[in-house]
């Protein structure tokens, strides 16, 4: 903070920049915004995170090969044990929600979503990096993939009875229930994407404000809060995805 400047005056001087940061959160290509580095940055960061994850997965695969040659298992946290705990937890969650058979069948979607969202969220901990999941384009893309696939899985498992099931058990209630069910199903990707974008974007914005005001020590508690937000939002997205897939693939009760 410059000399002979009050704290309130200094804070007010930062407001134009903070407002600009707030406007950039969730900016999409659909509006009247020109595509600049702010628009391409989330895409670049998403690609970078996916490449990084592939490299880490390759390293873990190499560790498994070396593990087969060793007699004593590792007793410390390594990249391999972290991946085991990470994907083991989400597989257990999918098994509890969808059942063992569906968890094994649909875990590639859940595990892939968990990895991408977690590492994208975690990039917010790096100073100067805007997490891809703070942009609505990226979160909508993730949510649309889940939306398309759980409907595809539902049609694959139950056929057209999956669509008929949306009309409810009684035919005379179908004109009322069917539109409500269709709307509630179509709203799912909207709520998934907006919830993730707002939580990560606002958390990152608040952390940026405090880092701009006080660079040392004070933002440390916010970093712990950010870690909680990162984990919770990954869990929420994947848990809801499991629920949607479970509801879509359960055998319809015909009346």
UniProtKB/Swiss-Prot annotation:
The chain crosses the membrane at residues 40-60, 109-129, 135-155, 163-183, 196-218, 230-250. Key component of the proton channel; it plays a direct role in the translocation of protons across the membrane. This is ATP synthase subunit a. SUPFAM superfamilies: F1F0 ATP synthase subunit A. GO terms for biological process: proton motive force-driven plasma membrane ATP synthesis. F-type ATPases have 2 components, CF(1) - the catalytic core - and CF(0) - the membrane proton channel. CF(1) has five subunits: alpha(3), beta(3), gamma(1), delta(1), epsilon(1). CF(0) has three main subunits: a(1), b(2) and c(9-12). The alpha and beta chains form an alternating ring which encloses part of the gamma chain. CF(1) is attached to CF(0) by a central stalk formed by the gamma and epsilon chains, while a peripheral stalk is formed by the delta and b chains. NCBIfam families: ATP_synt_6_or_A. Its main location: membrane. It comes from the Bacteria. It holds the Pfam family ATP-synt_A. GO terms for molecular function: proton-transporting ATP synthase activity, rotational mechanism. Belongs to the ATPase A chain family. One of its GO terms (cellular component) is plasma membrane. Signal peptide: none annotated. It is found in: Cell inner membrane. It is a multi-pass membrane protein. Keywords: ATP synthesis, Cell inner membrane, Cell membrane, CF(0), Hydrogen ion transport, Ion transport, Membrane, Transmembrane, Transmembrane helix, Transport. It comes from Sorangium cellulosum (strain So ce56).
